[in-house]
Amino acid sequence: MIITKTPFRMSFFGGGTDMPSFFNEHGGAVISTTFDKYCYVNVRHMPPFHPYISELVHNRFERVNNVEDIEHPLIRECMKMHDIHEIRLTYEGDLPARTGLGTSSTFAVGMLNAFCALKGKMMSKRQLAQEAIHVERNVLKEHGGWQDQVAAAYGGLNRIDFHDHDFSVRPIIISPERKKELDDNLLLFYTGVQRFSSEIQADTFAKPVDKTKQLLDMLALVNEAEKVLTDKEKSLNEFGKLLDTTWKLKRGTGSKVSNGSIDELYDMALKAGALGGKLLGAGGGGFLLFYCEKEKQEYLKNALEKLMIVPFNFENDGTQVLYYSPQSYSPRKEIILK
């Protein structure tokens, strides 16, 4: 049996510039962090006496006798990629899917990590990110960027740069005290709305209107935000104000990024004392993140009392094998269906 634990991520700056159609021409960068909410993937080989080959438990329950019959496209293609057969796989997440936290890519990274361990192989964080990007973007042709896979694999508070069909990861150098202050001043609220990121990304980049200027402005904010984080003489409140700036830019990149309800909640938060914030992910729903000084946080919580607040702390580990107990495996010779 193999169990992997892979963190979800929140992206602060640069979202949209991690799309190959943009960064291969202009370069791209994001600042993001993983936090202590995870997806867990449990994989083991099936005993040979069951009348089915594989059993998969995700948002649905599947029992199949052929990998090609698997309905979940990500599971199916990852199994084919690593020649995985006769398994029982279960997925559990601390937070709901399609909510702007990179859940699909986190699942991809965690599942690939588990499959490699099942095969007795070790893969680097870079290799796991590259494989997850390949299966989601090239094999499944899902529209989206690269940052989610990289963040889930590496973990931590990082600047991720994208260029020439490649990426590089650089940790943000920040004192533990300053990092804790940032952590303490960020509040996460669940709107209760789920959506498909790939559909919103496709809408954003399929429109004939050129979004290059907004994306270049969002890219420039990555440098500004990094300077705020790493310069101990600067107030972290500037980070919150930059979040407000990047959110306003992001809203201009697609009609599905926000809606009237989200805009109303955002305005309520600013009036209650938040310095800035954003809707995480591609937009359309999910989680709202706000930067708010501690002395004003009760006002913010009261203003958004209809939303669920999700306590969190930053984490640094990225995907990891939590439990490793390998099994001997031989393909079954005959399947008797009942």
Go through each PLM region and give its residues.
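Glycine-rich active-site/cofactor-binding loop and its immediate structural neighborhood
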Residues: 285
